[in-house]
UniProtKB/Swiss-Prot annotation:
Protein name: Dual specificity tyrosine-phosphorylation-regulated kinase 1A
Keyword set, alphabetical order: ATP-binding, Kinase, Nucleotide-binding, Nucleus, Phosphoprotein, Serine/threonine-protein kinase, Transcription, Transcription regulation, Transferase, Tyrosine-protein kinase
One Pfam family this sequence matches: Pkinase
Organism whose genome encodes this protein: Xenopus laevis (African clawed frog)
Gene of this entry: dyrk1a
UniProt subcellular location: Nucleus; Nucleus speckle
Domain Protein kinase: 151-471
Residue stretches of biased makeup (Basic residues): 587-608
SMART domains cross-referenced by the UniProt entry: S_TKc
GO biological process: peptidyl-tyrosine phosphorylation; positive regulation of DNA-templated transcription; positive regulation of RNA splicing; protein autophosphorylation; protein phosphorylation
């Protein structure tokens, strides 16, 4: 018994794990205090806990058994740096980086293995198009390469979805050109062939390059790429804005751009062309010279003719017209909408409607212009993408799904405030500047609102836009457009010789007398009459406006009344005779619903001017913004060439003043710094006279619309030698681009 007792005492585990009957056998009376079934359940439960802990935490046999409360606590821990909670919280970025590294490492290995397994694949990539193209169908440009013993490639200056543009030197013509290299793919080739056809058609009707369209010199196929050779141009208008730190250019310079663009759109609207550009934006309007205001429109890759519309998704979003957004039929008016957006952006420095998508774009348009008319939305296939129709038949703008973007109520973001009409311009930056009065801004706002008419049928047309008072100059205004006399494709001057008392009119196939040149690009031309008076423009004076029914060309080309003869001298030894219509009363304008009465005569002889060889005092009040690509004036000390004033007692006409007083040749021979636009020192963009006897000098000049003549509307304004000198000083200070420096960066012409 003693031995058994020792054995029992030495094995506490047997006592702990023994069932109740073993305690009875040992003489211990513990089982009587609890029921037999309860004891069995308790022992079974304890055994399960022990088994679970033993399997979860393997203990060393030599380790002492923990207390019951300690059995639930882990004895070993994972490295905190590898804990999932830490990886997905504090080290989340590191985790993602590691995932990316592993993913791309595997991808790179698979790519290398694939190339190793199929050596022909790598060889095929190398010799695509006999090694001349990359895998994106673009020609591999090599600087210094010579093409066809004619073109020496200088550098790549542009790239786009169409292909690439390179700067090259033409050794035959001895000039720099821009070559647009189309991708070696059928779809791009087909579209480029349309562009070539349209460019050739436009150049055919603009042989003197007067209408601000880029000149396509020639085209050819080279190594399976269609190549278009263009004249070399300078910066685009977006580059110009960027170099003003997006503060915008002056209203004077904006006016110059506006008139040239309207002239170009008038040219595109001629019946023989009827071309829609479809992608007007600052990037597609290029300066001809970094120190001049002359511009040209480029990139007709998306263009089409009126009867051959191909695409529905056209125009860059910021400049997309309502009819394109709404899916209704479009015509040439979409380019006028784009122009309105561009002009505001050029002056404010910021896009007028900068939508992130089409819904946002329409919402931003509605903020400024209000809800489109119901008759437009009722016919629009995509109206319900942007608007919802109320039970009473009106339309409201749809609320955004996320509700994050908040828009101002329709029509409450006024253009009046955007332009800063009464606050000194955008941001008050133009306060006190000459040419930025409230009256100037009211004219600008009015013409922009006419360009941004929702209804394409009543949206102002180029012909009428050119006659808006924004382009006119009054007796007290010296900063409006300059003395360009240039012709529109629809209304040309015919040649004539003799004195100012002789007038000849060319009907171009139609009979009758000429009454007006109102389709010409300078509708600001003021005319002398016997009393020495000239017409003055009031703030909202717009003699002809958008008609209710859209017309390609102005109504009434001929009238029975005899024209008034006016002489305007454009050179000390020359003068030009124009046909001026009799005075007419201004027709009051009701926006989008005006009625207009005008008489015009269509001249078909392009590029011909009526010149006579007599010296006369020159007329001062004739503003026009046309800037020739070849003819500009410097500000100097001598009075000669185009700015000279000849004193003549035989004429009582007032004189048209240029802002510089040295001839065009002097400007051409003057070295031009490549990185500056200081017009106060090197010339001015304010005024350019562009009627010459030498047809060669007319290259790059716009057309010249004449204004209606109205007697006794203002005092005569005569310019003396002293006044001209003072005028030159004013122009030096008010030069539209004085102080604007643009870093040299050649821009492709298309």
């Amino acid at each position: 018994m003693h031995t058994g007792g020792e054995t029992s005492a030495c094995k506490p585990s047997s006592v702990r794990l023994a069932p109740s009957f073993s305690f009875h056998a040992a003489g211990l009376q513990m089982a009587g205090q609890m029921s037999h079934s309860h004891q069995q359940y308790s022992d079974r439960h304890q055994q399960n806990l022990n088994d679970q802990q033993a399997s979860a935490l393997p203990y060393n046999d030599q380790t002492p058994q923990p207390l019951p409360n300690q059995r639930r606590m882990p004895q070993t821990f994972r490295d905190p740096a590898t804990a999932p909670l830490r990886k997905l919280s504090v080290d989340l970025i590191k985790t993602y980086k590691h995932i990316n590294e592993v993913y791309y490492a595997k991808k790179k290995r698979r790519h290398q293995q694939g190339q190793g397994d199929d050596s022909s694949h790598k060889k095929e990539r190398k010799v695509y198009n006999d090694g001349y193209d990359d895998d994106n169908y673009d020609y591999i440009v090599k600087n210094g390469e010579k093409w066809m013993d004619r073109y020496e490639i200088d550098s790549l200056i542009g790239k786009g979805s169409f292909g690439q543009v390179v700067k090259a030197y033409d050794r035959v013509e001895q000039e720099w050109v821009a070559i647009k290299i189309i991708k070696n793919k059928k779809a791009f080739l087909n579209q480029a062939q349309i562009e070539v056809r349209l460019l050739e058609l436009m150049n055919k009707h603009d042989t003197e390059m007067k209408y601000y369209i880029v000149h396509l010199k020639r085209h050819f196929m080279f190594r399976n790429h269609l190549c278009l050779v263009f004249e070399m141009l300078s910066y685009n208008l977006y580059d110009l804005l960027r170099n003003t730190n997006f503060r915008g250019v002056s209203l004077n310079l904006t006016r110059k751009f506006a008139q040239q663009m309207c002239t170009a759109l008038l040219f595109l609207a001629t019946p023989e062309l009827s071309i829609i550009h479809c992608d007007l934006k600052p990037e597609n309007i290029l300066l001809c010279n970094p120190k001049r205001s002359a511009i040209k429109i480029v990139d007709f890759g998306s263009s089409c003719q009126l009867g051959q519309r191909i695409y529905q998704y056209i125009q860059s979003r910021f400049y997309r017209s309502p009819e394109v957004l709404l899916g209704t039929p479009y015509d040439l008016a979409i380019d006028m909408w784009s122009l309105g957006c561009i002009l505001v952006e050029m002056h404010t420095g910021e896009p007028l409607f900068s939508g992130a998508n089409e819904v946002d774009q329409m919402s931003k348009i509605v903020e400024v212009l209000g809800i489109p008319p119901a008759h437009i939305l009722d016919q629009a296939p995509k109206a319900r993408k942007f608007f919802e129709k109320m039970p009473e038949g009106t339309w409201n703008l749809k609320k955004t799904k996320d509700g994050k973007k908040e828009y101002k109520p329709p029509g409450t973001r006024k253009l009046h405030n955007i332009l800063g009409v009464e606050n000194g311009g955008p941001g008050g930056r133009r306060a006190g500047e000459s040419g930025h009065t409230v009256a100037d801004y009211l004219k600008f706002k009015d013409v922009i609102l006419r360009m941004l008419d929702y209804d394409a049928k009543t949206r102002i047309q180029p012909y009428y836009a050119l006659q808006h008072s924004f382009f006119k100059k009054t007796a007290d205004e010296g900063t409006n457009t300059s003395n360009s006399v240039s012709t529109s494709p629809a209304m040309e001057q015919s040649q004539s010789s003799g004195t100012t008392s002789s007038t000849s009119s060319s009907s171009g196939g139609s009979s009758g007398t000429s009454n007006s040149g109102r389709a010409r690009s300078d509708p600001t031309h003021q005319h002398r009459h016997s009393g020495g008076h000239f017409t003055t423009a009031v703030a909202m004076d717009c003699e002809t406006h958008s008609p209710q029914v859209r017309q390609q060309f102005p109504p009434g080309w001929t009238v029975p009344e005899a024209p008034t003869q006016v002489t305007i001298e454009t050179h000390p030894v020359q003068e030009t005779t124009f046909h001026v219509p009799p005075s007419q009363k201004n027709v009051p304008h009701h926006h989008g619903n005006g009625s207009h009465h005008h008489h015009h005569h269509h001249h078909h002889h392009h590029g011909q001017h009526i010149l006579s060889n007599r010296t006369r005092t020159r007329i001062y009040n004739s503003p026009s913004t046309s800037s020739s690509t070849q003819d500009s004036m410097d500000i100097g000390n001598s009075h000669h060439s185009m700015t000279s004033l000849s004193s003549s007692t035989t004429s009582s006409s007032t004189s048209s003043s240029s802002t510089g007083n040295q001839g065009n040749q002097a400007y051409q021979n003057r070295p031009v710094a490549a990185n500056t636009l200081d017009f106060g020192q090197n010339g001015t963009l304010d005024v350019n006279l562009t009627v010459y006897s030498n047809p060669r000098q007319e290259t790059g000049i716009t057309g010249h619309p004449d204004y209606q003549y109205s007697a006794n509307t203002g005092p005569g304004h005569y310019v003396t030698e002293g006044q001209l000198t003072m005028r030159q000083g004013i122009d030096r200070e008010d030069s539209p681009m004085t102080g604007v420096c643009v870093q040299q960066s050649p821009v492709a012409s298309s």
